[in-house]
């Protein structure tokens, strides 16, 4: 895949958008350290970015199916490129201006996700999409390590304002680098309202029982397992182990495991791809399970490495099956439904977990999270067509 020029351009574009996305919170964190932004202001800016993302995802799914996927990527990237310097302009002056600009950046981020997913299906032949998706998700995992590291290194020689403008340049690359896909569908005079068009994508998703089951399992794991990582892991690292090194080590182990999983899925095609993917998703249950008892930190690291490995064993076949099975003209809308539910539930889970821990205690909540992570994929595996993530199995 890395020898094909069109895919290289697509891969570089997605990588640039990933770097810009992951770098922004760390750059704003540096602004808090140098007192040009308060902690409360940081929370507001990041919250508005998330809101912009969630609003844009379903809208962009409709637009990417209605018009050109490449055009949606272009305008999404340009939105991020233009809004990022505005965040820099508001730094130390106006949190309101920063928040409005961050909402536009978040909208650009949300708009490009389903469009990139659909554009991949246009650029890459069907029999090569699994290694292509593996290469893209590998880039995502590398950026989670590279973005904070690069930010810290660049901060030695560049100020926060310059770094924020730099994320705009990354968004510009994301806008300009990807290749053209298929020609946009011919416009029709009887276009349905956007909400009705999005509903058509929902109906397409309902035609695929494996998709609904897998999405429900993914949502359950994100709501419980991801929330345990976001809330419980930092506190347990501090209170039980007396050091933030356990938090850093667990997150690093997760990323390393995910990298291994992406490399593995570039070549491995199990016969029962759906079941293998759901087993991988269930591995996330070991993350909250490792936090239940005062085990050695190495056990926590191993559990998070397994979770990272498993999430890519799920992600790569999941994206590939969606691109293969969903009707092409509805792919962006179905992908936007996927991203809306999976990303949208993450902050909801975080909001619920802390009160649940206060009410019931650490151990019952973590045990419940682990149980859900194990049982939800197992239940999804029982649904007809889940074995290979294909409706053909039902015939």
Cite the ranges covered by each PLM segment.
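Alpha-helical transmembrane-bundle signature of multi-pass membrane transport and export proteins
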Residues: 1-395
């Amino acid at each position: 895949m890395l020898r094909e020029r069109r895919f290289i351009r697509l891969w570089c574009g997605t990588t640039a958008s990933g770097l810009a996305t992951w770098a922004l919170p760390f750059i704003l964190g540096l602004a808090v350290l140098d007192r040009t932004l308060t902690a409360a202001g940081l929370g507001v800016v990041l919250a508005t970015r998330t809101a912009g993302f969630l609003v844009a995802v379903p809208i962009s799914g409709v637009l990417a199916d209605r018009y050109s996927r490449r055009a949606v990527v272009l305008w999404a990237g340009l939105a991020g490129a233009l809004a990022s310097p505005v965040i820099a302009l508001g730094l130390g002056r106006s949190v309101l201006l920063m928040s409005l600009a961050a909402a536009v950046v978040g909208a650009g981020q949300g708009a490009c996700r389903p469009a990139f997913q659909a554009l991949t299906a246009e650029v890459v032949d069907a029999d090569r999409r699994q290694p292509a998706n593996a290469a893209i998700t590998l880039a995502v995992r590398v950026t989670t390590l590279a973005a904070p590291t690069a930010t810290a290194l660049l901060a030695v020689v560049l100020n926060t304002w310059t770094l924020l403008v730099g994320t705009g340049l990354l968004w510009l690359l994301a806008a300009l680098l990807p290749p053209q896909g298929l020609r946009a569908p011919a416009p029709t005079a009887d276009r349905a309202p956007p909400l009705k068009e999005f509903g058509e994508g929902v109906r397409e998703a309902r035609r695929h029982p494996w998709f609904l089951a897998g999405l429900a399992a993914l949502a359950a794991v994100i709501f419980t397992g991801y929330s345990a990582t976001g809330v419980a892991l930092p506190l347990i690292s501090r209170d039980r182990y007396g050091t933030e090194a356990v938090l850093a080590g667990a997150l690093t182990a997760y990323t390393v495991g995910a990298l291994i999983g992406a490399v593995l899925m570039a070549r491995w095609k199990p016969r029962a791809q759906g079941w293998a993917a759901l087993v991988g998703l269930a591995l996330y249950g070991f993350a909250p399970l490792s936090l239940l008892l005062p085990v050695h930190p190495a056990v926590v690291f191993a559990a998070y490495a397994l979770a990272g490995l498993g999430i890519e064993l799920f992600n790569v076949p999941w994206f590939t099956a969606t691109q293969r099975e969903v009707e092409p003209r509805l792919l962006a809308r179905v992908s936007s439904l996927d991203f809306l539910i999976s990303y949208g539930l993450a902050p909801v889970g975080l909001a619920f977990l802390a009160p649940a821990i206060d009410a019931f205690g650490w151990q019952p909540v973590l045990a419940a999270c682990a149980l859900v992570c194990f049982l939800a994929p197992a239940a999804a595996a029982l649904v007809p067509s889940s074995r290979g993530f294909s409706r053909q199995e039902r015939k």
